[in-house]
């Protein structure tokens, strides 16, 4: 895995763990973990989206805000790498 992708994945994992902790959810999170399966609510997903935007200094386009893109750390990593690569934000 490329260094940029590893860095993005680590940062996303950190943000996800922070949101889970704030929502009193104790779970072991891995890149393929389905966030809804570990207990993240729809409000938690909104909080996660806002924190991801802040962490990566991005404004996610409406078309990227989909359940598929926030399904797992790996899915968010792909979306963020695409956004960083496109120069959007």
Curated annotation (Swiss-Prot):
Recorded protein name is Aminoacyl carrier protein 2
Q: What is the lineage of its organism?
A: Bacteria, Pseudomonadati, Pseudomonadota, Alphaproteobacteria, Hyphomicrobiales
Where are the O-(pantetheine 4'-phosphoryl)serine modifications? Answer: 42
InterPro entries reported for this sequence: ACP-like_sf, PP-bd_ACP
GO cellular component, as recorded = cytosol; membrane
The post-translation modification note in this UniProt entry reads: 4'-phosphopantetheine is transferred from CoA to a specific serine of the apo-form of this carrier protein.
**Signal peptide position in this chain?**
none
> Which UniProt key words apply to this protein?
Phosphopantetheine, Phosphoprotein
Is Membrane found in the keyword set? no
Q: Please give a single GO biological process term from the UniProt record.
A: lipid A biosynthetic process
């Amino acid at each position: 895995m490329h260094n940029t992708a590893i860095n993005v994945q680590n940062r996303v994992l950190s943000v996800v763990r922070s949101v889970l902790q704030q929502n009193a959810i104790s779970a072991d999170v891995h890149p393929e973990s389905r966030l809804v399966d570990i207990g993240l609510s729809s409000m938690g997903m909104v909080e996660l989206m806002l924190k991801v935007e802040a962490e990566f200094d991005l404004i996610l386009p409406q078309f990227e805000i989909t359940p598929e893109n926030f399904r797992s750390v790996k899915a968010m990593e792909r979306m963020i790498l695409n956004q960083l690569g496109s120069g959007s934000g």
